Amino acid sequence: VSPERLALAGEFGASRALDARDGDTAARLREGGALDCAFEAAGSQASLDAALASLRKGGELVLVSLMGEVRLDAFDLVNRELRLLGSVGYRDAYPELIALLADGRLDLARAVTRSVPLEQAVEHGFEALLRDKSQVKVLVNPNPALADA
């Protein structure tokens, strides 16, 4: 997690943005009480474990990252009556967010730290995200000429 991403989370309204490398993330998330809902967006086993451990009984975990195989304690899920939901961001999954964007009440332009044409997506897009942790989101534009129109 980069300082830029943590700061941006606060700018977008997160009440807390934590760096998982700074100690017991689950305990820090539970300060003031366990969570009703957690979103796992980092794509690591450690962040998944922290998100699950931060939930109250009956809480919900939404997985929005892609991470391949993970370990889950099925007994814990059942015993604590947790709900697990996977989401890949289809248009009708976020109607409130889309309305905020359409009305101009939410500007996500600050999250886009780089824009690259499609033919440079790997070298200047994905590899930049891996090398430069200050990058937040890279926009891959299949037709840059339309962006200038």
Model-found features: residue ranges?
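Adenosine-nucleotide cofactor-binding segment
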Residues: 1-50
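Residues in the short beta-alpha loop(s) of Rossmann-like NAD(P)-binding domains
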Residues: 1-2, 67, 90, 143
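Glycine- and other small-residue-rich loops at beta-strand/loop junctions that grip anionic moieties
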Residues: 18, 36-41, 64-66, 86-87, ...
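Short glycine-rich anion-binding loops that position phosphate/pyrophosphate groups of nucleotides
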Residues: 44-45, 67-68, 145-146
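C-terminal hydrophobic helical "lid"/dimerization subdomain
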Residues: 49, 91, 96-149
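Helix-to-beta-strand junctions that scaffold the AdoMet/dcAdoMet cofactor pocket
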Residues: 55-57
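Short glycine-centered segments of the SAM/dcSAM-binding site in methyltransferase folds
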Residues: 59-60, 83
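Rossmann-fold NAD(P)-binding glycine/threonine-rich loop
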Residues: 65-82, 92-99
